[in-house]
Amino acid sequence: MEQRVSLVTLGVADLAASRQFYEALGWTSTSSPEDGVVFFRAGPMVLGLWSRAELARDSGTKDTGGWGGVTLAHNVRSPTEVDEVIGEARAAGATIARDGAPTFWGVYSGAFLDPDGHTWEIAHNPHWTLGADGAITLPG
């Protein structure tokens, strides 16, 4: 298996509302809720939105409703940009889990929850370089 991730699909309660939220963040969808799924190009990856019930059924699991132990991360080029993105999320209707602040491991980050409670960390890591396409270059 090649070492990469192609698609992350989030289970959502209201596909149209979730699409509207991500579009309010400035993202452009490539499909409509009438298709039953919404896709957003995210650099070399794709973010999908699909009904929680359908996603659970397709995955062969049960939708237990609680936090699934996954956090999505969006790395940026400066602490100022962390604060800007958290502000954009707030304006789009996100629940802010924590405003941008320094962490004990040297990163500046904040976090928000989308309408379905999916956690997004917005982070500036001074030890990682971001390419023009947003790809992370890991040290070593």
Enumerate the language-model features and the residues they cover.
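Short, flexible, glycine-rich and Lys/Arg-enriched loop motifs at helix boundaries
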Residues: 52-64, 129-131
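Short, hinge-like loop/turn segments at secondary-structure boundaries
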Residues: 48-49, 65, 116
